[in-house]
Amino acid sequence: MTHQISAEHLTIAKIAEIIEGHHTLKLSADAVKRITHCREYLDKKIAESDKPIYGVTTGFGSLCKISISNDQLSQLQINLMMSHACGVGERVPNDIVKIMLLLKVQSLSYGYSGVKLDTVERLIDLFNNDVYPVVYKQGSVGASGDLVPLAHLCLPIVGLGEVEYKGERMSGGELCKKMGWEPVKLGSKEGLALLNGTQNMSAHAVWAMIKAERLSKWADVIAAISLEAYDGRVEPFTHAVHAVRPHQGQIETAARMRELLDGSELIRQPKVNVQDPYSFRCIPQVHGSVKDTIRYVGSVIDTEINSATDNPTVCPDEDLIISAGNFHGEPIAMPMDFLCIAMAELSNISERRTYKLVSGTRDLPSFLVAHPGVNSGFMIPQYTAAAIASQSKTLCMPSSADTIPTSQGQEDHVSMGANAGVKLCKVCENTERVLAIELFNAAQALEFRRPLKSSPVLEHVIADYRKVVPFINEDQPMYPHIAKSVEFLQNEKID
């Protein structure tokens, strides 16, 4: 399928559909008109005006007072891209690079950046041909936009930088020869338009949002299985309890837990224990808070991915070219830090439920194995979950609380939003692993409640899970089962 790039509202769900469905991109007629109109306006203003225009007829950052002659305007832009490609460390995953390309095209298509049409179309060529520019995780301070990663993202269109194509790493020049493309010749302002923007931060945020929404759904299902295995009570999910403290996420989670447990034989059994530990009893309050955080962060990211984040902003209809600060990552850096905390909390409470399941209480055998002693059973998966949860806690220090001046103090306050995005994605991956370990334990523990059955919904999940992860009778290497559990969460359909 082909997705038309237009002014129509782009949602996170639509991005997921485009990426997962391997859709191609095409500019709408209206987008072509906006891009062309803005470029024509910019060229006209450069020709007519003797006033300096930041980044167009001047240097960059603290070099903004240096005027550039007309015969050097194109070289200025290519020099900018080359000099700003300073990324280090691990590569940004290809899935996120693909989202970066989509968001860069979307932002440029609004017609506020002054790029040429062929420049945008070459970015689309990269996307449509599954060409992944080699972009590095470290280097962006999140203002002036994502300069370093976007330099790496866009260098290949001018025949520089590096890409991965069909599993092979090659230079941008080699790619152009292989594809039969002429390297794009940048006009005035184009390098700045390509490098200024929040698409690296935003792409990490979008990826994390897609992952977080899925994990939030899984967390409820896995918690319900753990509750059944732990012989927990359903009363804490009663609607009347939550109606007197009606946070939206809390209400939704309690309702979801009631749905998941509906029809269970286990939940209807007389309970010896008057109440459950917090990690079970407070599922609506904790999981619900995560849902509310995801909802809030999603609303902010939704605005960001439908915005022009260039500088200067070119407004042809208002006859304005204004140097301002739409590149600053603070609006999304803070929410990404918030979501990082929420996802870490989801893993914290999950690990606590795992701990309870292996603790040898409520008629469950120690470490969920029939013959503990000679067998260590599920002792150590909880250690792994604890180690991962602990790492996530250390990653919750907000990146947006930090700033370091750059460019001789001209860019004296930055967002560090790129760091926020990178660690958010890491915490999401960590949370997925912790939840997978809880499922591994919960499914094992549930077998000690047989022949009683859980609800039809949960029994269906367990049946599918047992196709890839067996019941463990005796000690064996556990890491393959944990890996299969992670894959199950990634691949199994979840509503």
Regions found by a protein language model. Give the residues of each.
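Polyanion/phosphate-binding surface patch
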Residues: 49-51, 66, 253-254
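FAD-binding core of FAD-dependent oxidoreductases
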Residues: 54-68, 72-76, 83-108, 136-158, ...
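Conserved, non-catalytic sequence blocks in retroelement Pol enzymes and Pol-derived host proteins
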Residues: 112, 141-143, 373
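Cysteine-centered functional microenvironments
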Residues: 135-140, 317-321
